From Swiss-Prot:
It is an enzyme of class 3 (hydrolase). This is Probable cytokinin riboside 5'-monophosphate phosphoribohydrolase LOGL8. It catalyses: N(6)-(dimethylallyl)adenosine 5'-phosphate + H2O = N(6)-dimethylallyladenine + D-ribose 5-phosphate; 9-ribosyl-trans-zeatin 5'-phosphate + H2O = trans-zeatin + D-ribose 5-phosphate. Gene3D superfamilies: 3.40.50.450. One of its GO terms (biological process) is cytokinin biosynthetic process. GO terms for cellular component: cytosol; nucleus. Its EC number is 3.2.2.n1.
Amino acid sequence: MTLAAAAEAPAPTHAFAIAAEEVAMEPLSTATAPAAMEEESSSSGGGGGVGERRSRFRRICVYCGSAKGKKPSYQDAAVDLGKELVERGIDLVYGGGSIGLMGLVSHAVHAGGRHVIGIIPKSLMPREVTGEPVGEVRAVSGMHERKAEMARFADAFIALPGGYGTLEELLEVITWAQLGIHKKPVGLLNVDGFYNPLLSFIDLAVNEGFITEEARRIIISAPTAKELVMKLEDYVPEYSIGLVWEDQNQKQNNLVPELDSGITSS
């Protein structure tokens, strides 16, 4: 898809209102049969080659910076993560940029023959997309819709080093997991201890009674891409809050015709 075509594509309206609905559309099944996992991996839109390691994930959403960072190790980690996804037959969902760590991980996945879905607000395209876009680009109206679409397409989430935007996206999906809105694993690629201060803060919040031990275990971290993805594969969710978002969302959807009717008749 060309950059011009992506920019001209119509974006859905009511971005903030649809966020919760779209997150619940493609829940991750933790009991997918091995044969089905292998079939999904080979038919998910990427190259898919012989020798790919079997994965329960079809797509992983990667959050990361539009800058490369000062250390070469950050850049190496982005490339290594892209290669790890390729080896496991996993496609990539990301923020759509072609610069910084976003560009490195997306090019690595695309070069390996897997499918890449980039989701980016139209207003950011001139800033974060240079040259020919990588893979499939979906232009959306704003940041709320971007995050909802990324969550909807993904079966798991990984955060590489990044800044405010990366932290916002990361903490939001962690909060959604805590509330039971989704049951998808959330991982930190803790390159050179980049996320140690964040993990220390979270541990402090646990000690001070603001985060439960159970909620602390939502976050999975590892120093290398290979180790992190292995941990994500083994993740089993546990929640103390009984909110089942899919059920609540369905009840809300059933009320929509009644609400519309009431608005029309008033």
